[in-house]
Swiss-Prot record:
Functional note: Molecular chaperone. Has ATPase activity.
Keywords of this entry: ATP-binding, Chaperone, Cytoplasm, Nucleotide-binding, Stress response
GO molecular function, one term: ATP-dependent protein folding chaperone
Protein's name in the database: Chaperone protein HtpG
Region described as A: spans on this chain: 1-345
Chain spans, region C: 563-634
Start and end residues of each stretch annotated as B: 346-562
Complex and partners: Homodimer.
Species whose genome carries this gene: Psychromonas ingrahamii (strain DSM 17664 / CCUG 51855 / 37)
Tagged with keyword Heme: no
Gene Ontology CC, one term: cytoplasm
Subcellular location: Cytoplasm
Length: 634
């Protein structure tokens, strides 16, 4: 070996190695699945690059993975004749975990072995799983198209460092040799290895081969002669593209294992959809909904999308053009007959075929989720907990599917008064009271703030259901989804609450009478508060609270203004409308108060209380405290 160098693992890589060996030990056979999966990917990449440069095959176009073991040396070797790696690529891919969000990943680890193993699976440990069973790993590799002298050897014990050196390697591709720990000799068994390959890698589209010894001619149980066979490498797996098989040929277990292969996930998927489409565009899609959200779901820079194949030839990972951003959690494969084999990401950006494929895949996912929501509440609620907030991005991005997406939404409401978001818009509409033509909602910082808001008092009294919205995205969502099924979304904290037909004629007459009786009182309060408020008026939305503030119809809602301020965005200046409950004893007493100074202090205090209740804070808390103290002594 020449040009030998020692390198230290990056801190994150060393940390992950120790953690992974501890957390994944109970499922240690997955090391073979990971290494075979990587080898198959290397073959896919070579096949694609060879489309434009046939010399990369080096007169050896039969791509395969080979698996062997040596019981005396206690080694297992996985080799492929795929794309291979250069020295720089070896250092980049094997010396560090070149992934964004690694530190976020570590922050999410809980110390719970089951949960952590699931998270590590989401992260995609790949090659590093070798160290679960091996105390030393040797990698010999040469990149396709490079001379034999340009091979690279990588050696590590999986502790703090690794060695890289130049070697001579006749064949292209990668050979990984695992030097097993003394207590891992169970894997030095032909039957055991064949069983693991069949279990995890049957769906790999290239053959995974193991050596079969020659046999002599013998006599069978029925007396017939069994002919001799020559020693040969034989395929252990089916080696067919799983998505190209008909659904009737496939078992659920095969679908699940294929998902784990393409998604780098240790858990089964929640559900999937396998479809073959013929006609103007011919394509096959196999789309999966994961059971858990990845730790980096909100990292918009992270690549996402489907594995793209053209006529079963791998083209690219993370082809995001075929799935809208609000469905970025979907994993799967798209195999098109209509795209050119030399397709690039740039070509995909703006083609009629791409638009048709994207529309088709989007429809499949929305139909799949609709079906799941109808047949399995528990499974759909699990999906909603993990991905609901991402799905709420849908109406803004995909206006053509607004109603379909809206049907999938789940919220908390006054019907359940639970933090669990289980109420669909269809269920809400089915419970609407006679004469109700609006979907009422409230947005707040938290579920409890929404649930206990005074703005709900009259609606609760009348038995009118209100959606309780406390996700940060909710206010923005409703700006893009103003109505559903012909019913307008109406905020109970914005504008004058017009209950229309829900109020009796008798109640309306009583309200008109109160407007007249309290007119001079309202003017006195306006005079005291001046430009602190946009308007003062009587309210009919309160029953047990003396006052509240609301945003005017044309102004930004309090919650939206708060969110924009938190994000450092400029917020348009607006003042609240101050509403007073004429049936509350405090308001009745205030209306009769002759002392103008006391009247002013109580009016200010009621406004500050209403602001505190709605916004959660005051511009000048000390003034508020001073006012309370003054009134306590009055």
């Amino acid at each position: 070996m020449e040009h030998q160098q020692n390198h230290t693992f990056s801190a994150d890589t060393g940390k992950l190695l120790k953690l992974m060996i501890h957390s994944l030990y109970s499922n240690k056979e997955i090391f073979l699945r990971e290494l075979v999966s990587n080898a198959a990917d290397a073959a896919d990449k070579l096949r694609f690059k060879a489309l434009s440069d046939g010399s990369l095959f080096e007169n050896d176009g039969d791509l395969r993975v080979r698996l062997s073991f040596d019981a005396d040396l206690k080694t297992i070797t996985i080799s492929d004749n795929g794309i291979g790696m250069s020295r720089d690529e070896v250092i980049e891919h094997l010396g560090t975990i070149a992934k964004s969000g690694t530190s976020d990943f570590f922050e999410q680890l809980s110390g719970d072995q089951v949960k952590d193993s699931q998270l590590i699976g989401q992260f995609g440990v790949g090659f590093y799983s070798s160290f679960i069973v091996a105390d030393k790993v040797t990698v010999n590799t040469r990149k396709a198209g490079e001379p034999a002298s340009q091979g690279t050897c990588w050696i590590s014990t999986g502790e703090s460092d690794y060695t890289v050196a130049d070697i001579e390697k006749a064949g292209r591709g990668t050979e990984i040799t695992l030097h097993l720990r003394d207590d891992e000799t169970e894997f030095l068994n032909d039957y055991k290895l064949r069983g693991i390959v069949s279990k995890y890698s049957d769906h790999i589209s290239i053959p995974v081969e193991m050596f079969k010894e020659a046999t002599e001619e013998s006599e069978g149980s029925d007396g017939e002669k069994v002919p001799a066979t020559e020693a040969t490498w034989e395929a252990v797996n089916k080696a067919t593209a799983l998505w190209s098989c008909s659904k009737s040929e496939l078992k659920d277990e095969e679908y699940k294992e294929f998902y784990k292969h393409i998604a780098n996930d240790f858990e089964d998927p929640l559900t999937w959809s396998h479809n073959k489409v013929e006609g103007e565009q011919a394509y096959t899609s196999l789309l999966y909904i994961p059971k858990r959200a990845p730790y980096d779901l909100w990292n918009r820079e992270k690549a996402h999308g489907l594995k793209l194949y053209v006529q079963r030839v791998f083209v690219m990972d993370d082809a995001e053009q075929f799935m809208p951003t609000y469905l970025r959690f979907v994993k799967g494969v798209l195999d098109s007959n209509d795209l050119p084999l030399n397709v690039s990401r740039e070509i995909l950006q703006d083609t009629r075929v791409t638009a048709k494929l994207r529309s088709g895949c989007t429809k499949r996912v929305l139909d799949l989720l609709t079906k799941l929501a109808k047949k399995d509440d528990d499974a759909y609620n699990l999906f909603w907990k993990e991905f609901g907030q991402v799905l709420k991005e849908g109406p803004a991005e995909d206006s053509s599917n607004k109603e379909k997406i809206g049907k999938l939404f789940r919220f908390s409401s006054t019907e359940t008064d639970s933090t669990e978001q289980t109420v669909s818009l269809d269920a809400y509409i089915s419970r609407m009271t006679e004469g109700q033509d609006k979907i009422y909602y409230i947005t707040a910082d938290s579920f409890n703030a929404a649930k206990n808001s005074p703005h709900l008092e009259v609606l609760r009294e009348k038995g009118i259901e209100v959606l309780l919205l406390s996700d940060r995205i909710d206010e923005w969502l409703l700006s893009h989804l103003p109505e559903y099924d012909g019913k307008t979304f109406t905020s109970v904290t914005q504008g004058d609450l017009d209950l229309g037909k829900l109020d009796s004629e008798e109640k309306k007459k009583e309200q008109e009478k109160q407007e007249t009786e309290f007119a001079s009182f309202v003017e006195r309060v306006k005079a005291v508060l001046g430009d602190k408020v946009k308007d003062v008026r009587l309210t009919h939305r309160l029953t047990s609270t003396p006052s509240c503030i609301v945003a005017d119809n044309d102004d930004m809602s309090t919650q939206m203004a708060k969110l924009m301020a938190q994000m450092g965005q400029p917020v348009p200046e607006s003042k609240p409308v101050f509403e007073l409950n004429p049936e509350h004893v405090m308001i009745v007493k205030l209306a009769d108060m002759a002392d103008e100074d006391l009247f002013a202090q109580w009016s200010e205090l009621l406004l500050e209380q209403a602001i505190l209740s709605e916004k959660g804070s005051l511009d000048d808390p000390s003034e508020f405290v001073g006012r309370i103290n003054k009134l306590l002594l009055a």
